[in-house]
Amino acid sequence: MLQQVPTRAFHVMAKPSGSDCNLNCDYCFYLEKQSLYREKPVTHMDDDTLEAYVRHYIAASEPQNEVAFTWQGGEPTLLGLEFYRRAVALQAKYGAGRKISNSFQTNGVLLDDEWCAFLAENHFLVGLSLDGPAEIHNQYRVTKGGRPTHKLVMRALTLLQKHHVDYNVLVCVNRTSAQQPLQVYDFLCDAGVEFIQFIPVVERLADETAVREGLKLHAPGDIQGELTEWSVRPEEFGEFLVAIFDHWIKRDVGKIFVMNIEWAFANFVGAPGAVCHHQPTCGRSVIVEHNGDVYACDHYVYPQYRLGNMHQQTIAEMIDSPQQQVFGEDKFKQLPAQCRSCNVLKACWGGCPKHRFMLDASGKPGLNYLCAGYQRYFRHLPPYLKAMADLLAHGRPASDIMQAHLLVVSK
């Protein structure tokens, strides 16, 4: 069968280690996905599946487009360095003359000089999970034996910097860390971090369907389910982002790049680049599990969202399937009336469907749990975003806003 090219731009993220991880972070939503593959005690991608993934992904991409490989988990370093050497060799084999990039999300525990030299030499972009100072990070990010991991992650950060690896830091914002935005932000800045992404931690305890599948956390959908004790509160997530934005705009514009601010600016000026959950629709970013199974989204790895298997179907067939088309379009079609009439709709777009388990003001389902936080954040930003857009339009750097005095009238 000839490989088809999907009708629109897409992205595939691979999980070569499946849900296997060397840590036991309390809030991780992926560890329990091992229950979906009970027949396989070890969920690591074999060489045949690796080659199929690389070959199919490159073939499914338009020749003029960059092919962006993303490796995640579980913990992708568990596959060992040789696995990624083979991956890079396969990319060269099947992608001769093509522009290819690699990104890699890790907890950093297994990184050493050899790993970092490889990552630098092959221009990998590394996403390092680090939640802030030790007392915040160690509360939930622990080893299988319950030991703290902060020192190990800071060692990894030092190694990445030593080898000049391109990296960013991924910060999970939970109920505790949401109380200390500037402590988290300043700690990262003091550690030399320049690129930061803040991720809200929101999970519910499992419903009956999920329990039958051996899961502890609630599957997306419906309005049932008790929140976990570590889930961030909506208002506090909004205040967390606002506090960091206000701190950043006074001293760090052009020096520190906070992705949550970058996405908001992109939507404000009508430019591409906003993350999927702040786009009108989704469904163009799928994941490949260790055995070639393809799922609708990283947050929707459940049997009902399985699109097929790469060994039997092309990537194009699965991404352009009616099932996936409906999945992506429902992000907009199922917005409740409260969202459609909201004055920050075009900044928020309802957020991730996974978090839409609340009732809106009229009692209709589909409101995002984080709605109050998003409203607080997105209503705070426009005067500043407009000022930066105006500066850029006049050929001046956005950082000039740090010398400006804005009169912002609260509404």
Annotate each language-model stretch with its function:
Residues 1-106, 110-117, 121-122:
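Conserved alpha-helical substructure of the radical SAM core
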Residues 301-411:
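Flexible mid-to-C-terminal extensions adjoining Fe-S/redox cofactors in radical SAM and related proteins
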Residues 141-151, 158, 162-277, 281, ...:
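Radical SAM enzyme [4Fe-4S]-AdoMet core and its adjacent flexible, acidic
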Residues 290:
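A cytosolic small-molecule/anion-sensing beta-strand core signal
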